[in-house]
């Protein structure tokens, strides 16, 4: 029988006897915490429940717009998410590529289904963002323990993003997208819907067409052409069971009474998107792009989006995907490089960041100041805050007080080569690659709840 030797309790007193000058700075005192006597932090009484929102306008289908009204049945809105049933898709045997034709959904399918979404109070837009922001927010904020589940939620699964020919089928599937509106960031900035009787609160959505989401590719020469309804067994597909949900919190009568009578300022985050710029590595290897934002900017997202094929979404690299061995879609990680070599951020003709390599924005910045490091190539961020995930002010720059802010990029060598095209079938740049430069920002702003309405005291 194996014997187990332990330690005498007396030996622990030897550790305690080493208390000296340095320990006086580390331990003890009136404010010291006793780790073996837990203090309970009480909260006000509440309950929460999921609520399905009612559509008030439009049609929730491909290439359509629609909106939903936020219910006032609860007191606070904690978060929101959208669900959709993606239809089964089957390629015709006599499609335009015949036996060589394959179809698959683009990466980040549910991100890219949302062309644009906004939160509106009557006609005042409080927040608005596009699918590109969903890509970047997930890349830099999604911790590893949730990333696999999140990919399942938005359609990044083998059965959806790997090619099938006319003998197979893309399955019908229910997808879920958490919507990162400002009120979902923390329960402390939950939307006090019960205190806004004079505002109609709406969530609006503009959805992409299926032709911008479904990749139709030749499995031998990797040619990509736009899909049409005539290529599909069931014709033009339609979305099913599109639903928008929120989590409502219900509080006590006393707290509800105070909500309606006490003015309140809420520090929130908003998203700004700069106009997109054409990125031309062959003719302009060191482009300079103006950045025009306002308010207290805490975080910049930027990258070069590959726009060669309309249906190939969420591609921020120098190459287009190919099909290997006539069966597997590949992003060619060894060929599909970052289009950006380095970036200089300029304030009023002075370099704020001078020729910092792309790895600084893709790896170093998110390692120290982000929520996670992107797995995919081509994502960049610069964070003025000490922690991009913290709602409290921890650093920002007021772009409204700056003039002539710009980003100067140095194009990577592979971006120059691939922009010329002419590669082999499996090169990823058989066609000349086209690009556009994207810049987004997250800023602090203040929402004021007063007299039953929402407004911005600082516009």
Swiss-Prot record:
Taxonomy, superkingdom: Viruses
Coiled-coil ranges (or none): none
Transmembrane segments: none
InterPro entries (UniProt xref): Capsid_N, MCP_C, MCP_C_sf, VP_dsDNA_II
Keyword Cell wall biogenesis/degradation: no
Subcellular location: Virion
Zinc-finger as UniProt keyword: no
One Gene Ontology molecular-function label: structural molecule activity
Task performed by this protein: Major capsid protein that self assembles to form an icosahedral capsid. Represents around 50% of the total virion protein mass.
UniProt-recorded name of the protein: Major capsid protein
Source organism per UniProt: Lymphocystis disease virus 1 (isolate Darai) (LCDV-1)
């Amino acid at each position: 029988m194996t014997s187990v030797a332990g330690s005498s309790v007396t030996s622990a007193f030897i550790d305690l006897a080493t208390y000296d000058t340095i320990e006086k700075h580390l331990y003890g005192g009136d404010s010291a915490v006793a780790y073996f006597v837990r203090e309970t932090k009480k909260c006000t009484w509440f309950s929460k429940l999921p609520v399905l929102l009612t559509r008030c306008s439009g049609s929730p289908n491909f290439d359509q717009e629609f909106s939903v009204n936020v219910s006032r049945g609860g007191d606070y809105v904690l978060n929101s998410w959208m669900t959709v049933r993606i239809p089964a898709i089957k390629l015709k045997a006599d499609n335009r590529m015949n036996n060589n034709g394959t179809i698959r959904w683009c990466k980040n399918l549910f991100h890219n289904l949302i062309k644009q979404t906004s939160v509106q109070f009557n006609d005042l837009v409080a927040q608005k963002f596009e699918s590109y922001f969903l890509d970047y927010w997930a890349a830099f904020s999604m911790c590893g323990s949730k990333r696999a589940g999140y990919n399942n939620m938005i359609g990044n699964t083998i059965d959806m993003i790997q090619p099938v020919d006319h003998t197979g089928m893309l399955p019908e599937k229910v997808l879920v997208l958490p919507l990162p509106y400002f009120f979902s960031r923390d329960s402390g900035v939950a939307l006090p819907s019960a205190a806004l009787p004079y505002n109609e609160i709406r969530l609006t959505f503009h959805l992409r067409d299926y032709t911008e989401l479904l990749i139709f590719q030749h499995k031998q020469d990797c040619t990509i052409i736009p899909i049409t309804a005539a290529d599909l067994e069931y014709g033009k597909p339609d979305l099913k069971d599109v639903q928008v949900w929120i989590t409502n919190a219900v509080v006590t009568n006393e707290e509800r009474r105070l909500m309606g009578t006490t003015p309140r300022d809420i520090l929130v985050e908003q998203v700004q998107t700069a106009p997109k710029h054409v990125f031309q590595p062959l003719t302009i290897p060191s482009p300079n792009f103006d950045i025009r934002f306002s308010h207290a900017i805490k975080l910049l997202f930027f990258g070069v989006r590959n726009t060669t094929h309309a249906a190939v979404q969420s591609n921020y690299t120098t190459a287009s995907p190919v099909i290997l061995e006539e069966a597997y879609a590949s992003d060619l990680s060894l060929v599909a490089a970052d289009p950006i070599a380095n970036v200089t951020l300029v304030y009023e003709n002075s370099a704020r960041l001078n020729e910092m390599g792309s790895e600084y924005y893709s790896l170093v910045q998110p390692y120290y100041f982000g929520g996670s490091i992107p797995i995919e190539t081509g994502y960049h961020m610069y964070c003025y805050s000490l922690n991009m995930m913290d709602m409290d002010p921890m650093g920002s720059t007021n772009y409204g007080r700056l003039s002539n802010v710009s980003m100067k990029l140095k194009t990577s060598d592979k971006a120059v080569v691939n922009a010329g095209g002419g590669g082999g079938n499996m090169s990823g740049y058989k066609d000349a690659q086209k690009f556009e430069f994207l810049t987004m920002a997250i800023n602090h702003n203040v929402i004021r709840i007063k007299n039953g309405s929402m407004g911005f005291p600082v516009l």
